[in-house]
């Protein structure tokens, strides 16, 4: 069993997120909302497919793909991006490419 299976992960801190969203042209209201949310993330394996769930009080986002394969994802501000998720030890690497600039997010994952 992989180290992440059967666990959920809660975001504890986010650095530079407001500046990043501002650079993407996200408005002030959505930036304030995004900065106020600490989502819980879970990755569920079903056969060869993985579902990446991001759970927050305002909405739940689900994206499914084969592991380390590109998939379509809708961001909080409604943009469609191409994403790839991989693990490096206990870090989840979530890369997004869209009409603006690419984004890579590394998250340390101590389970809750």
From Swiss-Prot:
InterPro entries: Calycin (IPR012674), Fatty_acid-bd (IPR000463), ILBP (IPR031259), Lipocln_cytosolic_FA-bd_dom (IPR000566). GO terms for molecular function: fatty acid binding. The keyword Transport applies. GO terms for cellular component: cytosol; nucleus. One of its GO terms (biological process) is fatty acid transport. Keywords: Lipid-binding, Transport. Belongs to the calycin superfamily. Fatty-acid binding protein (FABP) family. This is Probable fatty acid-binding protein. It comes from Anopheles gambiae (African malaria mosquito).
């Amino acid at each position: 069993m992989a180290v992440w299976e059967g666990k959920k992960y809660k975001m504890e801190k986010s650095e530079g997120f407001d500046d990043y969203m501002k650079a993407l042209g996200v408005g002030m209201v959505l930036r304030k909302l995004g900065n106020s949310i600490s989502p819980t993330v879970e990755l569920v394996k079903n056969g060869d497919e993985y579902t990446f769930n991001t759970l927050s009080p305002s909405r739940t986002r689900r994206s499914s793909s084969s592991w380390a394969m590109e998939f379509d994802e809708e961001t909080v501000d409604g943009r469609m991006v191409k994403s790839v998720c991989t693990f490096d030890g206990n870090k989840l690497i979530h890369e997004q490419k869209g009409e603006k600039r690419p984004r890579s997010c590394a998250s340390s994952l101590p389970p809750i």
